[in-house]
């Protein structure tokens, strides 16, 4: 469905109305019956030393990608006509987040196919609902959504994914490592989109971006940001150190 929607947009078969006023309500998106959602401490650990551990790791990543699809399309539906996005930029905003959703859908498909090769599938293990809880917490503010979803949560993926790739390679799981390498490179562009649109919103609100980011993270995110940071990837995404280093533990 994500691919169909994006193709329709690019073909000029979809449009948006300038008077569009999406509801501030946010419910549970369409989901399969499984995975069963549980508190994070009850989710199977993600060690890569054995096949079961690698399946648990890939299942957790599949769940992240599944939720990231919904987050990207919710960004379009909820904020695509937001007044903090200049009118002449709204088509660009929508296209950016449709493309992100398309990428996340492809990432999910790659991971689920790899799970099938290992004799498993998405939904076979438990998962937690932290990403969608972040969507609910930021449903009323485009700046908060941009700060938390791409610039905190997705940026965290830039920090941890290279280590996952190396561990998978050491465990002899080259196919899984190759998939994560593809995802990692594309996630840099997703964080870059978040940074770009966050700066647009800051400009509309006459706010200094790093200071405003600190305020939003402290208001909408529990705890501090966790080093070590992948500053090379974050720099490539235009997420600079004055944003995240002051919030580190």
Features from the language model and the residues they span:
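Non-heme di-metal
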Residues: 1-249
